[in-house]
């Protein structure tokens, strides 16, 4: 199917963002992300832009994953569409980006999916997940703060102090408990009051979402004995603030996750690479 090109093309049609990549070997040679309007239209726009960047090389097939893939038919802009299971794409993509053959991928998109992947992603297990993710962050932000822009929310959170809205372990018991230090969160938003600034609430939202994901990811890693191979991916992981909170949270459990470059393209990369991985 792919004999005419050394390039692999993958799309991830998400609820908010449509992403696409061109892969050569295991490296990204071109990428693009745009807001998802109508899934088929957004996919076509990304595909056209990527194809225009490599006019000299023929690409006949596009691998598609994400929730919007069900809106596509058997072809797109004259290219054969191969639909890839999203969990398989997350597994393959996470391992590819991290340069690992096995690992636990915590993929933070609108919600969060957790996948244990082995043998470069040929074998995967759905470890679980949570509805808490980037969508939670933006939804609560819009309701509580009137902010819908992720960039604006992150900037506000950096100016705020989560401890002004969160109750810490030290606040309750006066010190650490077990593996949990005194400054760790005991209850998210327990202290929120009229005196809390918009920036403090923004910081608290980041804390809550990223701590929930970090704890769930750490527990899954221990359950699957993949503590040394945890990979965090997805659009939310690209945020410096979110990634720092996730790393700090997982460190409580002795886990140092890898957050690879281009982590936001995990599913698109996995879709593209599946055209090779699942045939070998």
Segments the model singles out, each with a brief description of its role:
Residues 1-4, 72, 77-106, 111, ...:
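Conserved phosphate-binding catalytic cores of ATP/NTP-utilizing and phosphoryl-transfer enzymes
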Residues 3-42, 49, 123-124:
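Short glycine-rich, Thr/Ser-proximal phosphate-binding strand/loop in the N-terminal lobe
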Residues 6-12, 59-63, 101-107, 129, ...:
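Short glycine-aspartate micro-motif
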Residues 35-36, 51-86, 122-126:
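Short beta-strand-loop/turn "lid" adjacent to the catalytic site in phosphate-handling enzymes
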Residues 64-72, 220-249, 264:
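Glycine-rich phosphate-binding loops at beta-strand->alpha-helix junctions
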Residues 91-97, 137-141, 248, 255-280:
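Glycine-rich phosphate-binding/hydrolytic loop that grips phosphoryl groups
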Residues 121-177:
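Glycine-rich phosphate-binding loop plus the immediately following alpha-helix
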Residues 178, 183-229, 260:
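Adenine-nucleotide phosphate-binding core of ATP-dependent small-molecule kinases
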